[in-house]
Amino acid sequence: DQGFNSWG
């Protein structure tokens, strides 16, 4: 998770 996406 990169922080802005909740699926990554």
Curated annotation (Swiss-Prot):
UniProt modified residues of type Glycine amide: 8
Keyword Secreted: yes
Keyword Secreted: yes
Coiled coil: none
Transmembrane region(s): none
One annotated GO biological process: neuropeptide signaling pathway
Domain of life (superkingdom): Eukaryota
Keywords per UniProt: Amidation, Neuropeptide, Secreted
Localization, UniProt: Secreted
One GO cellular component term noted in the UniProt record for this chain: extracellular region
Reported function: This cephalomyotropic peptide stimulates contractile activity of cockroach protodeum (hindgut).
Protein name per its UniProtKB record: Leucokinin-3
